[in-house]
Swiss-Prot record:
Substrate binds at residues 45, 194. This is Hydroxyethylthiazole kinase. The lineage of its organism: Bacteria, Bacillati, Bacillota, Bacilli, Bacillales. Keywords: ATP-binding, Kinase, Magnesium, Metal-binding, Nucleotide-binding, Thiamine biosynthesis, Transferase. The gene is thiM. Its EC number is 2.7.1.50.
Length: 269
């Protein structure tokens, strides 16, 4: 997997304008939609149980995010996910805050048990808690703790039969056999709410157009990280408000040439 291959997926997303169905949380809906539009994808936010199965059927990818968790949204996620499975639409799951409460953890484990996932993405604590591995968590944004992140990612990929993505200072992508590290991004991303949730939806746009899911995720993470770096160069001294706006600009303006120039990936043995 080389940077030229990775960069081509960015162009493919913009050429294809994939429809990404998001059942996401109320905190990030606007930011997620604008980020996908800036990238060149088409977002739809459909939550009603009466329509989610039909909407998932016509989407290029389905993103399930449990940030603001309510029983009616869990029901909608299950309906949409099962419809997506029947119609070969890739399902992405973001188990926000898994491990923070017993209810949240129960849902985070129930969804992969009921739905075949193409991708699961979270921080190390979230992914560890989904597969019932011990990892301390404090709040929905906790990602630090003790443990081997690559090992946890590989275990999750094997147990859930999916591509596991753990994001943090370094991002880990694995299907249990191929494992890739991505070293792009900027710390200011953690000062803007919803950047992780948007990332999962951006990955959705990439897997909608590239069926090699490891390659698709690596391309999405590299693109996202490079866009953040370019935005930070212009705005980091001004603060997170300016960064958020410039980041949307860079999601629109970051090119495949930028990916080839600034992308930092490493394939592990």
């Amino acid at each position: 997997m080389n940077m030229k291959e990775i960069s081509k997926v960015v162009d493919l997303v913009r050429e294809s304008n994939p429809l990404v169905h998001n059942i996401t949380n109320v905190v990030v809906t606007n930011f997620t939609a604008n980020g996908l539009l800036a990238l060149g994808a088409s977002p739809v936010m459909a939550y009603a149980k009466e329509e989610v199965a039909e909407m998932a059927n016509i989407a290029g990818a389905l993103v399930l995010n449990m940030g603001t968790l309510r029983p009616e949204e869990v029901e909608a996620m299950l309906l949409a996910g099962k419809s997506a499975n029947v119609n070969n639409v890739p399902v992405l799951f973001d188990p926000v805050g898994a491990g923070a409460t017993s209810y949240r953890t129960e849902v985070a484990r129930h969804i992969p048990a009921e739905i075949d996932l193409a991708i699961i993405r979270g921080n190390a604590a979230e992914i560890a808690n989904v597969i019932n591995e011990k990892w301390e968590i404090k709040g929905v944004d906790a990602g630090t703790g003790n443990g081997n992140v690559v090992s946890i990612a590989r275990q999750a990929a094997d147990e859930l039969n999916t591509v596991a993505v753990i994001t943090g200072k370094e991002d880990v992508v694995t299907d249990g056999e191929r494992t890739v590290l991505i070293r792009n991004g900027h710390p200011i991303l953690t000062k803007v709410t919803g950047t992780g949730c948007l990332l999962t939806s951006v990955i959705g746009a990439f897997v909608a157009v590239e069926k090699d899911y490891v390659k698709a995720v690596v391309a999405a993470l590299t693109f996202y990280g490079v866009a953040a770096e370019l935005a930070a160069v212009k705005t980091v001294e001004k603060g997170p408000g300016s960064f958020q706006i410039e980041f949307l600009n860079q999601l629109a303006n970051t090119t495949s040439a930028d990916i080839e120039k600034y992308g930092k990936i490493e394939e592990l043995e």
